[in-house]
A protein has these predicted regions:
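Long, basic/Gly/Ser/Thr-rich N-terminal segments
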Residues: 1-58
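Short hydrophobic "helix-edge" motifs at membrane interfaces and signal-peptide entry regions
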Residues: 122, 189-190, 307
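P-loop NTPase catalytic phosphate-binding loop
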Residues: 2-4, 56-181, 202-255, 259-262, ...
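Short acidic, glycine/proline-enriched loop segments that cap or flank alpha-helices
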Residues: 8-16, 185-189, 242-245
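Short helix/loop segment immediately N-terminal to the Walker
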Residues: 180-195
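N-terminal helicase ATP-binding lobe
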Residues: 34-50, 61-84, 202, 209-213, ...
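Structural motif
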Residues: 102, 193-198
Length: 317
């Protein structure tokens, strides 16, 4: 808490709050991580003295982000018994509370490496449909694990490829409607997750026939808006998530946002539009960046991220 005494010679505003954040975050590192707020956070104090009845509050957590190191990913997954997905040493994600996830990052930042980790951990707890426009590591992972994958074929155009994706998305939307009817009859009905994984979303929407692109966006929008209660989830990967890659309404439904690689005002503007990354201590190295988990368990503020380091079967990555 920072308790200003009024009247004061300085203005108590957002600029003051951010200056104190910069000082406190550097001074408390690495024992504590001060969580970045988009604007000043005031709380009332239990006192009758009007001069000190309010304080600036700075949310924080003990320690700093630490990378998880897994010597054998397959063995690690087989030993797991819960739906928790470990992200870092002191951060796990309950997949039952996930609606949609997004992983963004520039080329070579480690997006595919992070995606392979999530795919391996999701396989025991979710059905998977993988869309891989690059025909790269997600396809190799899917082949090894015998999972459905949609990838480009030599004798088909890009519009044919996106039309095939639309057909699968339409089937998933029908599944949502079926599950909604089942929930209407029995509100306690439990479903297994169905996760639709789309790598390089931007590659699908750019240069595609407008009617097919509009149908693709419409299906994505409906699945993102309706899939939460019926456990139909999206896991989207792209270099950036501007309005050309996914509709704004889909981006607003994302409750796990991951930005990997170079962090600055331009790179975070789509997943974290209100965030000024100044002052956030982001470690150097591959697979580092920011993560935001929006649920009732984690602080909604953005946290520094170090993606797990793991070892898996040769030939997948």
């Amino acid at each position: 808490l920072f308790i200003p005494r009024l009247p004061s010679s300085y203005v108590i505003d957002d600029a003051l709050y951010q200056k104190i954040f910069l000082i406190a975050n550097a001074a408390l590192y690495p024992r504590y991580t001060v969580l970045k707020q988009n604007s000043a956070y005031f709380i009332p104090l239990n006192t009758e003295d009007i001069h000190v009845q309010r304080a600036l509050f700075f949310p924080w957590k003990v320690g700093i982000s630490k990378r998880l190191v897994i010597s054998d990913l397959e063995q690690f997954v087989s030993a797991k018994t819960s739906r928790l997905i470990p992200i870092m040493e002191n951060l796990s994600l309950d997949y039952d509370k996930v609606t949609s996830m997004a992983i963004a990052g520039n080329s070579g930042s480690g997006k595919s490496y992070a995606l392979t980790y999530f795919l391996t951990l999701l396989k025991p707890i979710s059905e998977l449909i993988i869309v891989d426009p690059k025909f790269d590591s997600p396809s190799r992972w899917a082949k090894y694990h015998q999972v459905t994958v949609i990838h480009p074929k030599q004798n088909r155009s890009k519009s044919d490829f996106v039309s095939e994706i639309n057909e699968v998305l339409s089937q998933s939307l029908q599944l949502i409607y079926q599950r909604q009817a089942m929930l209407y009859e029995n509100p306690n009905q439990k479903f297994k997750h169905l996760t639709i994984v789309i790598d390089e979303v931007l590659a699908l929407s750019e240069g595609t026939n407008k009617a097919i692109k509009d149908a693709f966006f419409s299906l994505l929008r409906q699945i993102a808006l309706l899939g939460r209660a019926t456990k139909v989830d999206l896991l989207l990967v792209s270099q950036r998530f501007d309005y050309n890659s996914i509709p704004v309404s889909v981006r607003e439904q994302l409750n796990v946002n991951i930005q990997i690689g170079n962090i600055n005002h331009k790179t975070v503007q789509f997943l974290f539009p209100d965030l000024n990354p100044e002052g956030i201590v982001i470690p150097i190295g591959k697979g580092t960046g920011l993560i935001q988990i929006i649920d009732n368990e984690h602080p909604y503020q953005v946290l520094p991220l170090l993606c797990p380091t793991y070892y898996t079967k040769k030939g997948i990555l």
